[in-house]
Swiss-Prot record, chain B:
Keywords: Membrane, Photosynthesis, Photosystem I, Thylakoid, Transmembrane, Transmembrane helix. GO terms for cellular component: photosystem I; plasma membrane-derived thylakoid membrane. It comes from the Bacteria. GO terms for biological process: photosynthesis. SUPFAM superfamilies: Subunit IX of photosystem I reaction centre, PsaJ. InterPro entries: PSI_PsaJ (IPR002615), PSI_PsaJ_sf (IPR036062). May help in the organization of the PsaE and PsaF subunits. The chain crosses the membrane at residues 7-27. It is found in: Cellular thylakoid membrane. Belongs to the PsaJ family. It is a single-pass membrane protein. This is Photosystem I reaction center subunit IX.
Length: 181, 39
């Protein structure tokens, strides 16, 4: 009950907090395509590459050609982001949804992958724990079992939620060893 | 052959095989989708 009430309080506070102002000029950033310094940087990079193409040997020209294509594609893509006065793109990381691709989605993906690997290792250790020689299975990996653990761990958020809800994730107090004192 | 597969599954060797695969995957992703800054 206490946990439930504290969760409810946390939810109320989270919902009650004033929404951050969504207007982009207020964070001092403008779309990169409107920032003069960004345009200058783009022109400088592209023209230096074009100059290199003109002076390059026939063997090197295609390399610079490819580099030019990649660079112009990069600037085209970054021009949709928000830039500061210095002409470099800034990523908006405060969780606003119209910039989710800049931090929110990669961040969640990172947490998902980190949790996936951790959960896979954990379930492997739990699976070998009750066998004859668990230490041996840690140095000589049981590959089919490990692959199975990796596959089942793909659903780790659901599995973790289930274990937390059922209390299975906790060890009883008596089972936790303490050092002599 | 059994000894060789056993050698391949020792933790350091398995780790090197696995990480070679992962690093190669990252290199290839960066080759085909260079300069990723956003999704």
């Amino acid at each position: 009950m206490r946990t439930f009430l504290s969760l409810l309080l946390a939810l109320c506070i989270a919902l009650g907090l004033a929404q951050s102002v969504q207007a982009e000029p207020l964070i001092g950033l403008k779309p990169c395509s409107e920032v003069p310094a960004f345009q200058a940087l783009m022109n400088e990079r592209l023209s230096s590459l074009e100059e290199k193409i003109l002076n390059a040997s026939p063997a090197m020209a295609p390399v610079y050609q490819q580099k030019l294509a990649q660079t112009s594609k990069r600037f085209e893509r970054y021009s949709k982001l928000l830039c500061g006065e210095e002409g470099l793109p800034h990523l908006v990381t405060d969780g606003r949804l119209n910039h989710a691709g800049e931090f929110l989605i990669p961040g969640l993906l990172f947490l998902y992958i980190a949790g996936w690997l951790g959960w896979a290792g954990r379930s492997y250790l739990i699976a070998v724990r009750d066998e004859d020689s668990p230490e041996m299975k840690e140095s000589l990996i049981d590959v089919p079992l490990a692959l199975r653990c990796f596959l089942t761990a793909l659903a780790w958020p659901a599995a973790a939620f289930k274990e937390i809800a059922s209390g299975e994730i906790r060890e009883p107090e008596a089972a936790v060893p303490i050092s002599p004192r | 052959m059994a000894d060789f597969t056993k050698f391949l599954t020792t933790a350091p060797v398995a780790f090197i095989l696995f990480s070679s695969f992962v690093f190669a995957l990252f290199i290839e992703i960066n080759r085909f989708f260079p300069d990723i800054l956003t999704f």
